[in-house]
Amino acid sequence: MLDFGYYNMDCMAGMKLFPDKYFDVAIVDPPYGINAPNMAMGTNKSRTKNGYPAESTASRLKRSGQAKEWDSKPPTEEYFKELFRVSKNQIIWGGNYFNLPPTKCFVVWDKVQPWDAFSQAEIAWTSYNLPAKLFRYSNTGGANSEKRIHPTQKPIALYEYLVGAFKLSGGGWYLTPM
């Protein structure tokens, strides 16, 4: 078993090192398998930003020399089996894209943004037997804008909300593989 800390390793190999139900909750944002890097960001092709026309995330990453392959396929069934094995509860972003058990407790993140060309909300499947949750938060710019390491990175405020909504503070063990 691994010591507490951060590990840069294949999550499948890492999860296999832990006993059943070791983590109190796993909060994950796996690839949805929708090829997000190659989606054009917006439908107005005459739009420009800093002299560049509207383009896909993949094009921007290639131009910056940071191109990486991700989101071409969803996680395997084995991934979800292992995730459920090592954690007592789960919060899975993009849960609407996966074949998961029925639940009444979804988390809906209302992005509070007006553009029809972008997703106005994101959905997380949870294993909790609680009412559905709604979190309204704009991360499109201004005071709430955060520097991102990854194009699909969720805002810190969203994770702070999850900690409060699911009473996750108090020294439990949390897993965030992917």
Predicted feature locations:
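Short acidic active-site motifs
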Residues: 14, 78-79
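Class I S-adenosyl-L-methionine
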Residues: 17-28, 32-69, 73-75, 84-178
